[in-house]
Swiss-Prot record:
The lineage of its organism: Bacteria, Bacillati, Actinomycetota, Actinomycetes, Mycobacteriales. Its cofactor is pyruvate. Gene3D superfamilies: 2.40.40.20. Is synthesized initially as an inactive proenzyme, which is activated by self-cleavage at a specific serine bond to produce a beta-subunit with a hydroxyl group at its C-terminus and an alpha-subunit with a pyruvoyl group at its N-terminus. GO terms for cellular component: cytosol. Heterooctamer of four alpha and four beta subunits. Keywords: Autocatalytic cleavage, Cytoplasm, Decarboxylase, Lyase, Pantothenate biosynthesis, Pyruvate, Schiff base, Zymogen. The gene is panD. This is Aspartate 1-decarboxylase. It is found in: Cytoplasm. GO terms for molecular function: aspartate 1-decarboxylase activity. Belongs to the PanD family. Substrate binds at residues 57, 73-75.
Amino acid sequence: MFRTMLKSKIHRATVTQADLHYVGSVTVDADLMDAADLIEGEQVTIVDIENGARLVTYVITGERGSGVIGINGAAAHLVHPGDLVILIAYGTMEDAEARAYRPRVVFVDADNRPIDLGVDPAYVPPDAGELLSPR
């Protein structure tokens, strides 16, 4: 049996731009892509913390060190600059691999620079303010 599991996520990133007239996708700073083990063209789900919008798209590589999280195409109707979002990538794996797999969890600061890397999808860094862990 195959299971679809959380592969990686970038938690509470700030959207820096939105371009309705682009062909689609989300532009992500190359440093964040590396931290979250994302590659260009990989499918991601974007969850907008501000309004609850949830959408599926693919990643394109943004300028390294820029902090860019750019929403492109029709998704710009749902997600806007300044919104906090979670980018989630899933992977399909055999049951045994899924049970041992540790996802990459990336927390970022207000400028979308990685500040904490982990493997626990429910982990909350000590300096995360009002965020609560479900554990």
